[in-house]
């Protein structure tokens, strides 16, 4: 997940690495998204777009035939430990409608913990950070998420 406004130079630097499957760029970047997604595919990676909480989901539409995954940010990106944004489940539902006939995975990142995990149960991947890493008992926190 490249949290950078101009990710192409980073992609060029990692293009020969073999242990990377997906490259995620933000929909809100300064560079031409289509060109970057084409480069990602050209280098043999799967392409993924991250979308911030307040970005119009319809901006994803032009890229739905080329991307393999959408990362829905459930907090404003950039700072760990933020609370889960309560409108996120509605955004997930709306994005699921957009991709209903597509083979695109959905991922969420931000504010995921034992209280919010059930609100995102309809996605393929949930990224959990601070809830686990700030705990004195990370194994218990992981188990709490699996219930």
Segments the model singles out, each with a brief description of its role:
Residues 1-39:
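N-terminal active-site wall of soluble small-molecule enzyme domains
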Residues 2, 21-25, 47-51, 70-75, ...:
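Hydrophobic faces of well-ordered beta-strands that scaffold small-molecule active sites
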Residues 8-17, 55-66, 108-126:
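Catalytic cores of alpha/beta
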Residues 11, 33-37, 57-60, 89-96, ...:
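Generic structural signal for well-ordered alpha-helices
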Residues 23-31, 71-82, 123-142:
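Glycine-rich phosphate-binding active-site loops on the catalytic face of alpha/beta enzymes
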Residues 39-48, 88-110, 145-147:
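Alpha-helix-loop-beta-strand connector modules within alpha/beta enzyme cores
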Residues 53, 61-93, 97-100, 140-141:
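Glycine/Thr-rich beta-alpha phosphate-binding loop at enzyme active sites
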Residues 103-147:
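C-terminal alpha-helical cap/extension of soluble enzyme domains
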